[in-house]
Amino acid sequence: MLTLDTLNVMLAVSEEGLIEEMIIALLASPQLAVFFEKFPRLKAAITDDVPRWREALRSRLTDARVPPELTEEVMCYQQSQLLSTPQFIVQLPQILDLLHRLNSPWAEQARQLVDANSSITSALHTLFLQRWRLSLIVQATTLNQQLLEEEREQLLSEVQERMTLSGQLEPILADNNTGAGRLWDMSAGQLKRGDYQLIVKYGEFLNEQPELKRLAEQLGRSREAKSIPRNDAQMETFRTMVREPATVPEQVDGLQQSDDILRLLPPELATLGITELEYEFYRRLVEKQLLTYRLHGESLREKVIERPVVHKDYDEQPRGPFIVCVDTSGSMGGFNEQCAKAFCLALMRIALAENRRCYIMLFSTEIVRYELSGPQGIEQAIRFLNQQFRGGTDLASCFRAIMERLQSREWFDADAVVISDFIAQRLPDDVTSKVKELQRVHQHRFHAVAMSAHGKPGIMRIFDHIWRFDTGMRSRLLRRWRR
């Protein structure tokens, strides 16, 4: 069967002009005009998608089949072009019958032209073929326009769905034109409104926690530059962390009286459920007279010293991908879970804006992986946000998975980020030594995002940077009060 592309070539119909007209009409539609005004960053991303639209439309016209009736009429026209005038006169009755049988738009006009002339001359033969060709061109153009109109409606529907999705997620995930472009590319998947609303929900939560958002931005910029020393140095304040014995959850050392709700003895907690003893419980809480476990271990304390300023200039450093390990143990549930997921969303925003990769691994009793910056990034982000934090803590497996990933060539300059409360068993010696080797030999950097003030120093000392975001009730109230 004849293809539409072949028919266009035979009749010299310009399909490129029809495609350009359709694309211009699509870009000038009121829906896109309003969207471009509201989201100017996405305008460039959609405009960059125009070549793909053009190629898809061209492919559609190339593969389209011409109706059998029109195919038969075109074949008859081609055969008629090869006839001499005497041969054409002989074949004319059959040609007219064929046109009538095919319900050709040219059939009635052809019969009128023949009836209006008593004899068929060479000039009339040429005129007949010219007008017949014009009729075929009109039919081919109409067929092209019908197919393009169908494609336009389908394309407009697809663009509107992607605009709705991108418009909802642009304030959350697009920090610049690069991020907007990658967001538009990822919006091509089949997503329903209820799916991506989960990202909107965590985006709103992140906006309510500006300190958490700022922490993610600082981590993203932490590889921004390196310093170059100079001779004339001034003094500056320098803060460092020192270890000292303190009350941290490493070892139970006895009982004490305090107001530490997390370490409360069960009998004390039972009095809270007795109406007659409730006020007595609150009194002892205020006076720090509740019986709690006394814990013994090491803690980190901030020490402030003065030292010379040695920074003179900054040299831009390459920023690699993120490998983020998220603790999904039961202790990370609730508010910790919300913060961990929102923090990953903030890292995804940074990765899209800076054209970096963002790879998420959830560690508990098994490792679950998500690529948030790939073509299916939005679907992967939704699956990640739907995960529940109810497992145990296997920090060693997390580090082994990170180290295995870092050995791959495409991740040689990656930064590893571990999000946890770090209330877990000590790391095996082989894991610790391997991490130190990666830090020393390959300059890999390990970041800890600590969601608790009670993380074990023995675990956290292997990290290059510790970003603290205490999710305890006291810290949450203080942050709210400061805002």
Swiss-Prot record:
Keyword Cytoplasm on entry: yes
Q: What is its main location?
A: cytoplasm
Localization recorded for this chain is: Cytoplasm
Which UniProt keywords are given for this protein, alphabetically ordered?
Chaperone, Cytoplasm
Listed GO cellular component terms? cytosol
Question: Which Pfam family name is an example for this entry?
Answer: VWA_CoxE
InterPro entries from the UniProt entry? Uncharacterised_CoxE, Uncharacterised_ViaA, VWF_A, vWFA_dom_sf
Describe, as the record does, how this protein assembles with itself and its partners: Homodimer. Interacts with RavA.
Family assignment from sequence similarity? Belongs to the ViaA family.
Q: Give the function comment from the record.
A: Component of the RavA-ViaA chaperone complex, which may act on the membrane to optimize the function of some of the respiratory chains. ViaA stimulates the ATPase activity of RavA.
Q: Please report the name of this protein according to its UniProt entry.
A: Regulatory protein ViaA
- The species is Shigella dysenteriae serotype 1 (strain Sd197)
What lineage, starting at the top, does this entry show?
Bacteria, Pseudomonadati, Pseudomonadota, Gammaproteobacteria, Enterobacterales
